[in-house]
From Swiss-Prot:
DNA-dependent RNA polymerase catalyzes the transcription of DNA into RNA using the four ribonucleoside triphosphates as substrates. Keywords: Chloroplast, DNA-directed RNA polymerase, Nucleotidyltransferase, Plastid, Transcription, Transferase. Pfam families: RNA_pol_Rpb2_2 (PF04561), RNA_pol_Rpb2_3 (PF04565), RNA_pol_Rpb2_6 (PF00562), RNA_pol_Rpb2_7 (PF04560). This is DNA-directed RNA polymerase subunit beta.
Length: 1070
């Protein structure tokens, strides 16, 4: 609950509310709408009729729990049952049965679905709203050409344009256009009806010559002319029913279906009163659009801003799931139709249950969640990541834009985004501006528009009324900006406030304001709202910060921030990381796995998450925080989750930081840290990796899991139990066997060695005919085995593969190469870990934990980190935590600076440490070099900011290769750690080696270690016998490839070898 001094209290909406409400809307309305569209199906003789009775559909509660669905790689779904009837028309008999249509994946309260054991989330999409839009462009002569674009509900486009002679054309394809009279006539109007329904009939008559009269002489002629231009068909086509059907399918269905949103937009734009249930484009719409186009030509009316949010619509999870359900019903209709015809043909008596099968619906949803671009794997790096992922908005996807073709204007911030789409939080790279994030208070309205709340300012009533306004509505009001929140109404003189009106920012008197913002964070997303002093940062750095907070790794010992914004608790609550009491009661038992809550005469068991792996290999873990015997209330926090402390989000640590150079170790965003962070586990995190192996039934027999693996050392098998699976609690190293498995194979008699055949003949010893296919621990996977699961797919078939999963936990301290970041876009890589005694230390003897480069602040203009740094120091000394809303300058000038200095001054007085606040250089202090004990020349800013450890860790990136695969074409090592790739020396690396004059190393890089096939084969042999490695005599493979590519361009390139002794030229073919 958040309030302000001038009004009542407002509640922040649930951060997962948009996703969950969308799914509920699909279940309540979307299912019924699509089921009502399901037609009655008759056989070819029209003797049997099949139909669904929509009023009695039901969804069954799943038999498994969410956690089991994840572990067993199943889909957490509900079975859909509908009543269906089969009617025999001759006897009027009807057979009614409840049939199973298929499974619909369910969504939990966090807005996620579990499909095949994977958490997935559906992203909301921004599309151009269907309707008509007018714009003006300059032709090659510099004359304005006005066009009106009609966008259908399917995304199809048709254009009306008016030329210099005021003639109106309809562009039916990129190259062809027809007269508006021909189009209207083809849609069913005659000339008299056209002239009666337009405002400017004389303009329509002005370009009506004899040729045009002939084209619109009859409906058939108009349709033929329209078809000829649309299909680019020459000759004289003949009017027929098939021609009309083709035109209906290819043009009218794709480009003329407006939908309910398009019909509403069309009526409002053209002042029409066509009923909302008439969702197709009518001749009346075409003529009204032409009238509006004529008005624009003569200076009446206004052009449309295509990037305004009033011209966009949100394609929510409800719309996407409803579309897929409709597609599944179309497939089901085809199946039922074919089954009825087959049953009649074979003289079988069908029943509703025999006609309907579940695969169409089940497979449609599985393919949607698995393949659709807007269905993504939920990012579960930390609790904040899970919330933010569900609130993304994407311009990409089917029917939307692409990263290559989107213009700068579309990516840019628009005034209509105010309070609806965050101006800060977007992705970096090619998709910048195309993937945004919802503002905190934004919601999706009934017509698919984004709505934002405002307080209405009225002189007639003293109460506060909150309005949710769509993007087009708030332009007619004077909306006061953020700093109007602190007005003192007792002062009678006129007060001037900044306000927004018709996409412009003005300064007006308070009496003229109609609406005002309800909350300082109203414009920002969750990620941007967690940045303290965000108003002092450059927007680019705030963008990086909101993205990097999502990459923070949950630490083993979390700590909440000293300086925050107040939204940390709400973010933790809505993330699902906390265990919350569902009712009142008393704690009767607690352990690491569950909490027992007694109340209302029964006992409720609340399970806790124990060392659960996320899909980013981070550790999800809950720790109970209520003692046994304590009485609790409903909604109280029972257990903290990963990266939460006391019910608040805790992604990092408050560490002592100095901004100063130190021997060049923190240049170019490098960071110098103290070994205290390593030894005291300040930035230690746990990571859980999953390794799995499948057992199949092959043609030679089933694969066998065993601990008796021939030809392997006993040391590698030391951790296996009797079944051949690694034991819980074992410490495993690289190369150890996690699961022993043998695969049977056929071995011919001739392939045995002579001694094997002798043993078989004399002693009857059977030599192993199985191949070892064990699960081995890869490089970098060392750790402790914390869980082993042996899973068999449900169904009972012997051909279902069994899956064995081994979970290994790794403890990772911070080390050189890891990435750390603050909350202001100040990121860096650990360059050196210094002993504590060598780190700079304060006047009270405490050594600094981190040293940042001060040059990273002025050029990047993220000064908020300095305010946070100094206020964090004061808070640590005073044992206080601060929660500061942004834009505090709305209360007084330099409010942030005054707050920080006053807290530092108070900390200096209470701790009797005058160095905490020195008036000559406030916020700075003289510190000492730990190596010499001498003070540094200049005072240094010291403080306690909140620093995060990011998931970009050196253990996941560092890689070495001794042998591996080569690319087929270039014969060079593959690229990347995942493919066991090797070094790839580019031209800049060659320049660097040339600069040092290392000729032999350079030759090795370009030949033996790269793509010289014969030379690298000779290296192995000469190394084994201890000989000298011969110099390669011919060109490497990449040079030969270049020669061949030049030959394909008819260019011949030859190279020669010149002898050092007699300078003879020896020509070698490439």
């Amino acid at each position: 609950m958040l309030g302000d001094g001038n009004e009542g209290i407002s509640t922040i909406p649930g951060f997962n509310q948009i996703q969950f409400e969308g799914f509920c809307r699909f279940i309540d309305q979307g299912l019924t709408e699509e089921l009502y569209k399901f037609p009655k199906i008759e056989d070819t003789d029209q003797e049997i009729e099949f139909q669904l009775f929509v009023e009695t559909y039901q969804l069954v509660e799943p038999l498994i729990k969410e956690r089991d669905a994840v572990y067993e790689s199943l889909t957490y779904s509900s079975e859909l049952y509908v009543s269906a009837g089969l009617i025999w028309k001759n006897s009027r008999d009807m057979q009614e049965q409840t049939i199973f249509i298929g499974n619909i994946p369910l969504m939990n309260s966090l807005g996620t679905s579990i499909v095949n054991g994977i958490y997935r989330i559906v992203i909301n999409q921004i599309l151009q709203s269907p309707g008509i839009y007018y714009r003006s462009e300059l032709d090659h002569n510099g004359i304005s050409v006005y066009t009106g674009t009609i966008i259908s509900d399917w995304g199809g486009r048709s254009e009306l344009e008016i030329d210099r002679k005021a003639r109106i054309w309809a562009r039916v394809s990129r190259k062809q256009k027809i007269s508006i009279l021909v189009l209207s006539s083809a849609m069913g109007l005659n000339l008299r009806e056209i002239l009666e329904n337009v405002c400017y009939p004389e303009i329509f008559l002005s370009f009506l010559n004899d040729k045009e009269r002939k084209k619109i002489g009859s409906k058939e002629n108009s349709i033929l002319e329209f078809y000829q231009q649309f299909a680019c068909v020459g000759g004289d086509p003949v009017f027929s029913e098939s021609l009309c059907k083709e035109l209906q399918k290819k043009f009218f269905q794709q480009r003329c279906e407006l939908g309910r949103i398009g019909r509403r937009n069309m009526n409002r734009k053209l002042n029409l009163d066509i009923p909302q249930n008439n969702t197709f484009l009518l001749p009346r719409d075409i003529l009204a659009a032409a009238d509006h186009l004529i008005g624009l030509k003569f200076g009446m009316g206004a052009l449309d801003d295509m990037n305004h949010l009033k011209n966009k619509r949100i394609r929510s999870v409800a719309d996407l799931l409803q579309d897929q359900f409709g597609l599944a019903l179309v497939r089901l209709e085809n199946v039922v139709r074919g089954t009825i015809c087959g049953a009649i043909r074979h003289k079988l008596i069908p029943t509703p249950q025999n006609l309907v099968t579940s695969p169409p619906l089940t497979t449609t949803y599985e393919s949607f969640f698995g393949l659709h671009p807007l269905s993504q794997v939920l990012d579960r790096t930390n609790p904040l990541t899970q919330i933010v992922h569900g609130r993304k908005l994407s311009y990409l996807g089917p029917g939307g834009l692409t990263g290559r073709t989107a213009s700068f204007r579309i990516r840019d911030i628009h005034p209509s985004h105010y309070g609806r789409i965050c101006p800060i939080d977007t992705s970096e790279g090619i998709n910048v501006g195309l993937i945004g994030s919802l503002s905190i208070h934004a919601r999706i309205g009934h017509w698919g528009s984004l709505e934002s709340p405002f307080y209405e300012i009225s002189e007639r009533s003293t109460g506060v009324r909150m309005l949710y306004l769509s993007p087009g509505s708030d332009e007619y009001y004077m909306v006061a900006a953020g700093n109007s929140l602190a007005l003192n109404r007792d002062i009678q003189e006129e007060q001037v406030v900044p306000a927004r009106y018709r996409q412009e920012f003005l300064t007006i008197a308070w009496e003229q304001v109609h609406l005002r913002s309800i909350f300082p964070f109203q414009y920002f997303s969750i990620g941007a709202s967690l940045i303290p002093f965000i108003e002092h940062n450059d927007a680019n750095r705030a963008l990086m910060s909101s993205n990097m907070q999502r990459q923070a790794v949950p630490l083993s010992r979390s700590e909440k921030c000293i300086v925050g914004t107040g939204l940390e608790r709400q973010a933790a609550l809505d993330s699902g990381a906390l265990a919350i009491a569902e009712r009142e009661g008393r704690i009767v038992y607690t352990n690491t796995h569950k909490i027992l809550l007694a109340g209302n005469g029964d006992i409720l068991s609340i399970p806790l998450v124990i060392y659960q792996r996320s899909n980013k290999n981070t550790c999800m873990h809950q720790k109970f925080r209520v003692p046994r015997g304590k009485c609790i209330k409903k909604g109280q926090i029972l257990a903290d989750g990963a990266a939460t402390v006391g019910g608040e989000l805790a992604l990092g640590k408050n560490v002592l930081v100095a901004y100063m150079p130190w021997e060049g170790y923190n240049s170019e965003d490098a960071v110098l840290i103290s070994e205290r962070l390593v030894y005291e586990d300040i930035y230690t995190s746990f990571h859980i990796r999953k390794y799995e192996i499948h057992t199949h039934v092959t043609s030679q027999g089933p694969e066998k899991v065993t601990n008796e693996i021939p030809h392997l050392e006993a040391h590698l098998l030391r951790n296996l139990d009797k079944k051949g699976i690694v034991m819980l609690g074992s410490w495993v190293e690289t190369g150890d066997i996690l699961v022993g498995k043998l695969t049977p194979q056929v071995v011919k008699e001739s392939s045995y060695a002579p001694e094997d055949r002798l043993l078989r003949a004399i002693l009857g010893i059977q030599v192993s005919t199985s191949k070892e296919t064990c699960l081995k621990l890869p490089i970098g996977g060392r750790g402790r085995v914390i869980d082993v699961r042996w899973i068999q797919k449900r169904g009972g078939s012997s051909y279902n593969p069994e899956t064995i999963r081994v979970y290994i936990s790794q403890k990772r301290e911070i080390k050189v190469g890891d990435k750390v970041a603050g909350r202001h876009g100040n990121k860096g890589i650990i360059s050196k870990i210094l002993p504590r005694q060598d780190m700079p230390y304060l006047q009270d003897g405490r050594s600094v934990d981190m040293v940042f480069n001060p040059l990273g602040v002025p050029s990047r203009m993220n000064v908020g980190q300095i305010f946070e740094c100094s206020l964090g120091l004061a808070g640590s000394l005073l044992d206080r935590h601060y929660r500061i809303a942004p834009f505090d300058e709305r209360y007084e000038q330099e409010a942030s600076r005054k707050l920080v200095f006053s807290e530092l001054y108070e900390a200096s007085k209470q701790t009797a440490n005058p160095w905490v606040f020195e008036p000559e250089y406030p916020g700075k202090s003289r510190i000492f070099d730990g190596r010499t004990g001498n003070p540094f020349e200049q005072p240094v800013i010291i403080g306690k900011p909140y620093i995060l450890k990011l998931i970009h860790q050196v253990d996941d990136k560092i890689h070495g290769r001794s042998s591996g695969h080569y690319a087929l074409v270039t014969q060079q090592p593959l690229r990347g750690r995942a493919k066991q790739g090797g070094q790839r020396v580019g031209e800049m690396e060659v320049w660097a080696l040339e600069g040092f004059g290392v000729a032999h190393i350079l030759q090795e890089m370009l030949t033996y270690k790269s793509d010289h096939i014969r030379a690298r084969q000779e290296v192995l042999g000469t190394t084994i016998i201890g000989g000298t490695i011969p110099n390669p005599e011919d060109a490497p493979e990449s040079f030969r490839l270049l020669v061949r590519e030049l030959r394909s361009l008819a260019l011949e390139l030859n190279h020669f070898l010149v002898s050092e002794k007699n300078f003879q030229i020896n020509r070698k073919e490439a």
